[in-house]
Amino acid sequence: ADAAASAPGTAGDVVLLKPAASVVYLNGGAGRPEAEAMRRDAAHWPLRIAFQGAPGPVAGVHLAVADARGHTLLRLAHGGPMTFVMLAAGDYRVTASYHGHAQTREVRVGPEGQDLDFRWTP
């Protein structure tokens, strides 16, 4: 792999790890090696989000994570198939939209972390 492919924030053999304002997130899982790498690291992330469509995992999800006061902490235009977010314990609102179909979930992140699954079916 060339240097650009292995640099943080670029596509390649590594998953993407990027800071967004004060929130660090990991987004990827499109290929089998990338998905397996993310699953191995999942326990280290307080909020673990997966996106599924009718045939399987989907990417290109519009994602927003807001705190209990409504302040947006993370906004992605191309989330998935998995997005892990480093958050402090607390209450959050997560909104995910795929092909114009939005879903919103209220989630409490605690010491064990929290898994969220968003599914879109025809």
Mark where each language-model region is.
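Short beta-strand segments within Ig-like beta-sandwich modules, predominantly Fibronectin type-III
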Residues: 73-78, 108
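Hydrophobic loop/turn residues within beta-sheet-rich immunoglobulin-like superfamily modules
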Residues: 87-90, 108-110
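Short amphipathic beta-strand segments in non-cytosolic proteins
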Residues: 62-73
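A short tyrosine-centered beta-strand micro-motif
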Residues: 90-96
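Short, surface-exposed beta-strand/beta-hairpin micro-motifs centered on an aromatic residue
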Residues: 80-86
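Primarily secretory-pathway and cell-envelope proteins
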Residues: 2-61, 98-122
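A generic structural signal for beta-strand entry/edge sites
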Residues: 82, 91, 113-115
